[in-house]
From Swiss-Prot:
Interacts (via LRR repeats) with BCL2 and BCL2L1 (via the loop between motifs BH4 and BH3). Interacts with NOD2; this interaction is enhanced in the presence of muramyl dipeptide (MDP) and increases IL1B release. Interacts with EIF2AK2/PKR; this interaction requires EIF2AK2 activity, is accompanied by EIF2AK2 autophosphorylation and promotes inflammasome assembly in response to danger-associated signals. Interacts with MEFV; this interaction targets Nlrp1a to degradation by autophagy, hence preventing excessive IL1B- and IL18-mediated inflammation. Changing residue 291 to Q: In strain: DBA/2J. The leucine-rich repeat (LRR) domain may be involved in autoinhibition in the absence of activating signal, possibly through intramolecular interaction with the NACHT domain. Changing residue 975 to S: In strain: PWK/PhJ. One of its GO terms (molecular function) is cysteine-type endopeptidase activator activity. This is NACHT, LRR and PYD domains-containing protein 1a. Residues 1092-1175 form the CARD domain. Residues 799-932 are annotated as: ZU5. Changing residue 857 to N: In strain: PWK/PhJ. Changing residue 88 to Y: In strain: PWK/PhJ. It comes from the Eukaryota.
């Protein structure tokens, strides 16, 4: 018990020092080790700087360092604790300098980007399937990049990460490397190791097993150019550090080595001109769970962790700011100081700037120290301008900091001394940038020289950060925050000074004026405005946002872009909070849409903004989002469709809607995961005299109970709603009647679904006369249908609609052409094909099953897209069909496949067109007001995944009974009606009969292999099946199971090959075998009564003819011309040769096919005999 308590206290102390180095609660667990190590490091550093590094001394240093390295057992939890940083793997192209989240438009479409874990940093690149040699970790200041980099090194050392990928991992702080003028490769490697692990020659002998971690690559003022790629110096020869690093990154030295870089900026091309295409990973900070976990570690759960985190949770803005690990440390430090001073715990800060000022007020003890603080601010500003983060003792003295002041700043944690050198640095780079911004505020220039001073400050900032990235710089954001009226008062109180407020405020306008006036507004500017929070400034700047319109993500999908709508990509809760805060002051934004994916949403009727986000939104952020919106008095339309909303989030939304100041008129909540539980909240809004006039609740499972609660709100006289979009197909007749009654009593109220399937639309006959009875029109259409031979299909192929089943008729079985005559307006669904039509009037629809191979092989899309559904050629009267539901077999419930990857391919005379569906549902992609041509669903492939995606599949079992012997054919295929039909037709030719058994319940994966087994000892060939997609015109994979005499039941099973988990099983009984043979498919009238042997056994011949060339030699001159002979022989495999031969046989006469049969009997007699024996010795027209 005591030992456990001691461990907890030790962990708490470590966490409290964490922010001073790298936002890591268990960082530097062995301070004593560092002190000893530093003694050797200091001497090593002196040798490097003096350029005296004899080989014997190097060996001695290595031997001396090695025994000192011991790791605390507490570091074992580090890997577990910090894998929860949100990592977002991006796909930006090289040369694209705008970070997605920093611009009004993404540099590339982001559908392929995704969240990853730390183990996946060096995973295969999307598109190449190769592991990257260069990974760039990017992110905002204080977000945890350095923590992640150090974690990779430590986890590798402990054998938990990349141990098989890299034999040696070297960690470098670029701020420290920049202190050296010259280094050799050997010296660099010594710098990157805690202790030497092998001789330098051995290390360099396998460059592909080396990982160099360069932390803060963009911090020093250097250009890492590979100046002379052809000159390869010996590893012991020295060269300028920037040249050495440039040669490594440019692959002139150790071309097989891998690199992990951390940086704030994505515009690395100016620092590293030879940089190759990297894998870019953005760190998005802490999840909500990790924020709580951080507080528990810092204070100890029982010693204040719960109390402090509860306090922070009560301030939603502060909780959101804490997604940045550095801010978490800052908040914890402030609360700890309050505890030590015995004051009441209180933290009301809404911005990072206010939090930093609170930190200063709590940590700087007296007026003397505050005077010294001015000098520290000057040091910080000088370092920012010169891109320096390490300072010598003489640098501090030059700024007027004496030993006592230095010691005091070290004690309170503002400064820290580097363990590996004699240098000093600020506790965090963000803290240095805050002090730098403070130095500009504390400048004592006379008022008459203020404009000149402001110009000089802005020029310095522009020179340091560049115009394009000016608003991304923390120094500039802190400046905006410090120049708010409220914060200026705090500064005056803190430093007991008087600041010229109006003069200082001019600095903001100088910054805004000097930045590119025609540059599209960026997310960084909104962050600056949020830090300032001045209403006048915000109103003025946000008023100008409407001046620049730029393409949005929808434009990338070739859709029509609304020119009055702005598009902004956000990634974090903090981004969302900042944007919605600023929107309150933008009078032009009257519509707002928040999408979790880049997809087409509702079209706005007023100027608006679309926000795109790929990570989930927390309840705390929803609360801030909605509380900001209640103050946005110009906002009229809000579209949250597709965002999963918790009960807490909907409660926050409804609280906002009930406020009198909320002017929202239109609210779209389509597919938000709402249930009947939420309806009481929504009903309270309807009866609260809210301004809401239109509400869309489609694609939510509200149920009868939920809709009844909505009806209570609709009956309230205070309800202003005029349009309610509501799915009614699943509602009971009683509830639908209640809705109709409400409409009848309130003529201004319309309750409907988007498709209005129950509405009867008057139709016109050929003479333009209105036909009221749609049955009469149906009769007329039947009379006009022509003289084609038609026959009804079975009941499973019927369409089910408002009046019950509608029969589907066969127009041309050989072409797979069918016709259905829908008798009235409504919704019709065919269970067999999965097709679903919504029509406005009676209409005749023709449906032809097509093979993808006929169309897709002619396009380049087969490399980038994959088929995920059947291909139909649909013909219908224009305008009669308002929606078509095309089936797909992707298992969306697995959460792996993004619905924005779905496209509908239209094959037209002038080429192929890809259309984005209106929405993608569990089994369908929906097209609204469709135009018809051969069409089906394609899925854009993510190269790293390829075809390996979860799908709904089906098993097809067929049997053939010969005397008393039974043979089964077992197929495992995607749940595609066209494939099922093609297999049915093929098996029917061989007189096999299908047995219906349930399909696999769980999703299976395309590209995976599965093992077929039986409860009895039977012959199964092959025993392994691959789940793959093959076009209906191609032969499908199946296992043949020879049972022999079946006198008892038998169980068939399918297991995945990798884990041998059971995926499907079926029990076959003797009673399943029907004695009657299936009828032979009707052949065309002018065709022979039966198929030729060659056509009847095409599939087996393709699969089983093992020697094609002798067969071709016998056909040469008789059936095959010289050109045809060479075309077939040019194919690489026997199966491809046979397929090519069969493609040529389409034009052959019956005599030519007889020639083929004779040649086959001579070259493959045993194969022919085996086929004939299975048919009972009957040869068909041979």
């Amino acid at each position: 018990m005591e030992e456990s308590q001691s461990k907890q206290e030790s962990s708490t102390k470590v966490a409290q020092h964490e922010g001073q180095e790298d936002v890591d609660p268990t960082f530097k667990t062995k301070k004593l080790m560092e002190v000893e190590l530093m003694k050797h490091r200091v001497q090593l550093e002196r040798n490097l700087k003096l350029r005296t590094f004899p080989g014997a001394r190097t060996k001695q240093v290595k031997e001396a360092l090695y025994p000192l390295l011991t790791w605390s057992s507490k570091s074992k939890n580090l890997f577990q604790n910090f894998t929860k940083l949100l990592l977002f793997k991006k796909l930006c192209q090289r040369g694209s300098e705008n970070l997605v989240r920093e611009s009004w438009y993404p540099c590339v479409p982001e559908e392929e980007a995704h969240m990853i874990d730390i183990q996946d940093l060096f995973g295969p690149n999307l598109g190449t399937q190769k592991k990257p040699q260069l990974v760039i970790i990017e992110g905002a200041a204080g977000i945890g990049k350095s923590t992640l980099a150090r974690l990779v090194k430590r986890a590798w050392k402990e054998g938990k990460l990349y141990r098989n990928d890299f034999h040696h991992v070297f960690f470098f702080s670029c701020r420290e490397l920049a202190q050296y003028e010259q280094l050799s490769l050997a010296e660099l490697i010594v710098q990157g190791q805690e202790v030497p692990t092998a001789p330098i020659r051995q290390i360099l002998s396998h460059p592909e097993k080396l990982l160099f971690i360069l932390d803060g690559i963009d911090e020093p003022a250097w250009v890492l150019a590979d100046q002379n790629p052809e000159l390869c110096l010996h590893w012991s020869q020295t060269q300028p550090v920037h040249t050495l690093l440039g040669s490594l990154l440019g692959k002139s030295i150790l071309p097989g080595a891998s690199f992990l870089l951390t940086t704030r900026t994505t515009a690395l091309q100016k620092f590293i001109p030879s940089l190759e295409q990297p894998c870019q990973v953005e760190v998005l900070g802490f999840t909500l769970f990790e924020r709580k976990n951080y507080f528990y570690k810092y204070f100890g759960k029982k010693k204040g962790g719960v109390t402090t985190f509860t306090l922070v949770k009560s301030n939603s803005a502060l909780l959101t700011l804490c997604e940045v690990p550095w801010v978490c440390w800052l908040v914890c430090t402030c609360l700890k100081k309050q505890m030590e001073q015995g004051g009441e715990l209180s933290l009301t800060s809404q911005t990072t700037t206010a939090l930093c000022l609170k930190y200063l007020s709590l940590t700087i003890p007296g007026q003397h120290m505050r005077t010294q603080l001015r000098d520290l601010c000057s040091l910080a500003a000088e370092g920012v301008c010169q891109r320096r983060t390490l300072f010598s003792e003489s640098d501090l003295c030059k700024q007027g900091l004496d030993e006592h002041a230095i010691a005091s700043f070290l004690k309170i944690g503002v400064l820290q001394k580097q363990a590996s050198s004699l240098s000093y640095s600020f506790a965090h780079l963000c803290l240095q940038e805050f002090f730098a911004a403070m130095s500009y505020i504390l400048d004592d220039s006379e008022e008459r020289h203020a404009d000149m001073k402001n110009d000089r400050i802005v020029e310095t900032l522009v020179e340091r950060y560049g115009r394009q990235n000016l608003f991304e710089a923390p120094t500039v954001r802190f400046l905006f925050g410090l120049l708010s009226k409220e914060e200026l008062k705090k500064i005056e109180k803190l430093f007991s000074c008087s600041l010229h407020g109006k003069t200082k405020l001019k600095l903001l306008w100088h910054i805004l004026g000097k930045s590119q006036p025609h540059q599209p507004p960026c997310l960084g500017l909104l962050h600056c405005l949020y830090e300032n929070q001045d209403m006048e400034l915000l109103t003025h700047v946000m008023h100008d946002l409407q001046g620049t319109i730029v393409p949005g993500p929808d434009d990338l999908a070739h859709t029509v872009l609304q020119t009055n709508v702005k598009h902004l990509v956000i990634q974090t809760d903090m981004d969302l909070m900042v944007v919605t805060f600023c929107i309150k002051f933008c009078c032009h934004v009257r519509s707002l849409q928040l999408n979790r994916k880049v997809q087409q949403g509702h079209k706005f009727t007023a100027p608006g903004m679309v926000l795109y986000r790929w990570t989930p939104i927390t309840d705390a952020s929803w609360k801030i989002f909605f509380s900001n919106l209640k103050l946005a008095r110009n906002l009229e339309e809000l579209d949250l469709s597709g965002n999963p909303l918790s009960y807490y989030a909907v409660h926050s939304l409804c609280t906002t809607l009930r406020k009198r100041g909320c002017q929202l008129k239109t609210l779209w909540l389509v597919e938000c995961g709402l249930t009947s539980t939420y309806c009481s909240l929504l009903a309270s809004v309807l009866s609260a005299r809210s301004s809401l006039t239109e509400l869309d609740l489609q694609l939510n499972d509200l149920g009868d109970g939920g809709v009844k609660m909505l009806c209570e709100g609709l009956r309230n006289p205070a309800c202003n709603l005029s349009i309610l979009w509501l799915d009614q197909a699943s509602l009971s007749d009683q509830v639908i009647a209640e809705l109709r009654t409400l409409e009848a009593k309130n003529p201004k109220l319309l309750i409907s679904s988007t498709w209005k399937p129950h509405v009867m639309v008057p139709t016109m006959n050929m003479d333009k006369e209105e036909v009221g009875d749609s049955q009469a029109l149906l009769k007329q259409q039947r009379q006009q249908s022509g003289d084609k031979h038609m026959e009804p299909l079975g009941t499973e192929d019927e369409f089910w609609g408002p009046t019950g089943p509608v029969t589907t008729e066969v127009v041309d079985r050989e072409r797979n052409l069918y016709r259905v005559q829908l008798p009235m307006a409504g919704s019709y669904h065919c269970p067999s094909t999965g097709l679903h039509f919504v029509v406005t009037r009676a209409v005749t629809i023709e449906i032809e099953f097509c093979a993808w191979s006929q169309y897709l092989d002619k396009t380049p899309l087969q490399q980038s897209h994959m088929v995920v559904g059947p291909l139909f050629d649909i013909k219908a009267e224009q305008g009669a069909v308002t929606a078509v539901y095309l089936p797909h077999f992707v298992a969306l419930q697995e959460g792996i496949v993004d619905s924005s990857l779905f496209h509908v391919a239209h094959f037209q005379e002038h080429g192929m067109v890809l259309e984005t569906p209106a929405r993608v549902e569990q089994h369908y992609a929906v097209l609204e007001n469709p135009s018809f041509s051969p069409m089906g669903i394609l899925l854009r492939m993510i190269p790293a995944v390829g075809h390996f995606i979860p799908i709904t599949s089906t098993t097809l079992i067929y049997y053939h009974l010969y005397l008393e012997d039974v043979t089964f054919h077992l197929y495992l295929v995607p749940n595609d009606c066209s494939i099922r039909k093609a297999i049915d037709d093929e098996e029917m030719k061989f007189q096999f009969v299908r047995i219906n058994k349930p399909p696999p319940v769980d999703a299976l994966y395309l590209g995976s292999r599965y093992i077929v087994s039986s409860s009895k000892l039977v012959e199964i060939i092959p025993k392994e099946l691959e789940l793959c997609y093959r076009s209906p015109g191609e032969s499908q994979l199946f296992s043949e199971i020879d049972i022999g005499h079946m006198d008892s039941e038998i169980k068939l099973q399918i297991k995945d090959k990798r884990h041998m988990n059971l995926k499907w099983e079926a029990l076959l009984k003797p009673g399943d075998l029907r004695p009657a043979l299936p009828k032979i498919a009707t052949a065309p009238k002018d065709a022979p009564s039966l198929l030729h042997f060659m056509d009847q056994h095409r599939e087996q011949l393709v699969a089983r003819v093992t020697s094609v060339d002798p067969l071709l030699d016998k056909l040469h001159g008789l059936v095959l011309s010289e050109d045809s002979y060479e075309v077939v022989r040019s194919e690489t495999t026997n199966q491809d040769k046979m397929r090519k031969l069969f493609s040529l046989s389409r034009s052959w006469s019956w005599d030519c096919k007889d020639q083929f049969y004779q040649a086959l009997k001579e070259t493959h007699p045993h194969l022919v005999m085996d086929i004939l024996e299975k048919l009972g010795g009957v040869s068909v027209k041979s």
